[in-house]
Swiss-Prot record:
<feature type="binding site">
    <location>
        <position position="40"/>
    </location>
    <ligand>
        <name>Mg(2+) 2</name>
    </ligand>
</feature>
<feature type="binding site">
    <location>
        <position position="176"/>
    </location>
    <ligand>
        <name>D-ribulose 5-phosphate</name>
    </ligand>
</feature>
<comment type="similarity">
    <text>Belongs to the DHBP synthase family.</text>
</comment>
<dbReference type="InterPro" id="IPR017945">
    <property type="entry name" value="DHBP_synth_RibB-like_a/b_dom"/>
</dbReference>
<feature type="binding site">
    <location>
        <begin position="39"/>
        <end position="40"/>
    </location>
    <ligand>
        <name>D-ribulose 5-phosphate</name>
    </ligand>
</feature>
<comment type="subunit">
    <text>Homodimer.</text>
</comment>
<feature type="binding site">
    <location>
        <position position="44"/>
    </location>
    <ligand>
        <name>D-ribulose 5-phosphate</name>
    </ligand>
</feature>
<keyword id="KW-0479">Metal-binding</keyword>
<keyword id="KW-0464">Manganese</keyword>
<dbReference type="InterPro" id="IPR000422">
    <property type="entry name" value="DHBP_synthase_RibB"/>
</dbReference>
<protein>
    <recommendedName>
        <fullName>3,4-dihydroxy-2-butanone 4-phosphate synthase</fullName>
        <ecNumber>4.1.99.12</ecNumber>
    </recommendedName>
</protein>
<feature type="site" description="Essential for catalytic activity">
    <location>
        <position position="176"/>
    </location>
</feature>
<dbReference type="GO" id="GO:0030145">
    <property type="term" value="F:manganese ion binding"/>
</dbReference>
<keyword id="KW-0460">Magnesium</keyword>
<dbReference type="GO" id="GO:0009231">
    <property type="term" value="P:riboflavin biosynthetic process"/>
</dbReference>
<keyword id="KW-0686">Riboflavin biosynthesis</keyword>
<feature type="binding site">
    <location>
        <position position="155"/>
    </location>
    <ligand>
        <name>Mg(2+) 2</name>
    </ligand>
</feature>
Length: 234
């Protein structure tokens, strides 16, 4: 973990950072999420898919790697009938890419910011189905694990978890932040980018702790209620 930037003893501040990220997403703004230094050691710029703008897609293309990914739940992936990109995933962190997609209508080459936005909107529409999309394309869906960051500490799961916690559609767009020379941005550059653009910055581990703190009391209350109900019916 990037402990020099986010000491574990600052748990209250960590929770506040996650809350700030959720507020930003609700307001249609972006957030930055970093993972462990021993994992991918990268920062992803993340936007809510439901409020995504052409300008935000252009920023992902300009400031990041340009590989714009749409993070979806397993249910959404099945509804869109998107098979995984490969049947035998041998990537180090088991990132669950599906086949790439394009909107079936309303796009030209599919690669422009406007076209990629059209594709994303087509994929997340309430009535979206397999016929709304062509395959392959220039947007890369990622399937999140059902348990979110508690099951897999990845940016895909962090994105979907953040959207759910913010009360938004459980789908978001991410792209890895890069430096002007094309190299991957590391923590000093990610922090500088966050400050320059006013994007809240959190770690995956902070999101894990946020979920544990927020969900554990609810789970205990439910268990107590179930126990009390069992005693009453005994």
């Amino acid at each position: 973990m990037n402990q020099s930037y986010f000491p574990h003893h600052q748990s209250d501040l960590s929770l506040q950072r996650v809350e700030a990220a959720l507020d930003a997403l609700r307001a249609g703004q972006g957030v930055l999420v970093t993972d462990d230094e021993q994992r991918e050691n990268e920062g992803d710029l993340i936007f809510a898919a439901q409020s995504l703008t052409r300008e935000q897609v252009a920023m992902l293309i300009r400031e990041c790697s340009g590989i714009v990914c749409l993070c979806l739940t397993d249910e959404a992936v099945r509804r869109l009938d998107l098979p995984l990109m490969v049947s035998d995933n041998s990537s180090r962190y088991q990132t669950a890419f599906t086949v790439s997609i394009e909107a079936a209508e309303g796009v030209t080459t599919g690669v422009s910011a406007a076209d990629r936005l059209t594709t994303i909107r087509a994929a997340i529409a309430d009535d979206a189905g397999p016929l709304c999309l062509s395959r392959p394309g220039h947007v890369f869906p990622l399937r999140a694990r059902p348990g979110g960051v508690l099951e897999r500490r990845g940016h895909t799961e962090a994105t979907v978890d953040l959207m759910r916690l913010a009360g938004l559609k459980p789908c978001g767009v991410l792209c890895e932040l890069t430096n002007p020379d094309g190299s991957m941005a590391r923590m000093p550059e990610i922090v500088a980018f966050s400050r320059k653009h006013g994007f809240p910055l959190i770690t995956v581990e902070e999101l894990v702790q946020y979920r544990i703190v927020r969900e554990q009391p609810a789970a205990l209350l439910q268990a107590e209620a179930e126990s009390a109900g069992a005693l009453c019916s005994a």
